Amino acid sequence: MAEKEHYERTKPHVNIGTIGHVDHGKTTLTAAITKVLSEKGLAQAQDYASIDAAPEERERGITINTAHVEYETDKRHYAHIDAPGHADYVKNMITGAAQMDGAILVVAATDGPMPQTREHILLARQVGVNYIVVFLNKTDLVDDPELIDLVEMEVRELLSEYDFPGDDIPIIRGSALKALQGDPEQEKVILHLMDVIDEYIPTPVRDVDKPFLMPVEDVFTITGRGTVASGRIDRGTVKINDPVEIVGLKDEVKNTVVTGVEMFRKTLDLGEAGDNIGALLRGIDRDGVERGQVLAKPGSIQTHKKFKGEVYILTKEEGGRHTPFFTNYRPQFYFHTTDVTGVVELPEGVEMVMPGDHVTFTVELMKPVAIEKGLKFTIREGGHTVGAGTVSEIDD
């Protein structure tokens, strides 16, 4: 048994999720995938009800319901997320609570693309989910094959509209419910869908293979040795004698060299993504580095003040604002490990933003921060979270 355990770890890991309009069959498809793969010993079958009863989670001060399902194909190990409500999807994608490397867009052939179909495609584009495979569901309920062709064409056009390769995206037709009920033809369709996902959604670059980045959480001095910046490594690796830059909150970037890496008071040869470490920095005094800055591989990240954000604003019930806000709203934007005040500029045609809204707006920060497309942030007022966002574009 232990050997099998070891083998499972060698499969590449990919995060995916189901997206699409309410009642188009996202959860049924998720259940069908687990059922069909369980028959090959690659998953534990989960029924609709258990996936639908998604547990509540908190991600950066926001409550989200998400179901996490695991399964394998012959080639890969997958973590699959499915969210019960539309608001849960929006919050999930914006907060990055469930990071997706690719998505299965479920569209009912009986309805065609609907408003949430469009909104989920837009969200996928804005938050950096770059690969979509389409499952055209409920095709057994449509008598005229020409109608299905028409729906497929509409879906392709919609994807192209949001800069996805609409003409090339794989579209699989089938019935998730029939597969779940054990129809052998539809079970084959599910296996085909998984083959397509294996092929079309690339294995992501592992965090450790990306350029080094560590948001600084704390700074202290070790007498006789120098200044230590501590934090959790976001990506990449760091070792003794690596050159790093101290970036953020100030206009100039400082260059230094890591002269020691420690974890739990022990010296470490190599710190990697996920590790909480302290990095000893050559020639940097106590006030030469501060919380909210980042240590990074030279040249890998710049500071910016102006960006566009894809944002979800909490409702009053979620602990958010009770009233709308307008252009020139000035909350704090919490990036990495610190708050920076910023001024909000709403897009043309948007007069105000209500609690519970999903909106794209421009922010001008009071201080430069090390940010890049895809970075997550929280919006706060007096220490309370009132929203969450993803940087969708750098504007300066």
Curated annotation (Swiss-Prot):
Region annotation (G5) ranges: 175-177
Residues bound to GTP: 20-27, 82-86, 137-140
Family as reported in the entry's similarity comment: Belongs to the TRAFAC class translation factor GTPase superfamily. Classic translation factor GTPase family. EF-Tu/EF-1A subfamily.
Annotated spans, G2: 61-65
SUPFAM superfamilies: EF-Tu/eEF-1alpha/eIF2-gamma C-terminal domain, P-loop containing nucleoside triphosphate hydrolases, Translation proteins
GN (gene name): tuf
Protein name: Elongation factor Tu
Domain of life assignment: Bacteria
Keyword list, A-Z: Cytoplasm, Elongation factor, GTP-binding, Hydrolase, Magnesium, Metal-binding, Nucleotide-binding, Protein biosynthesis
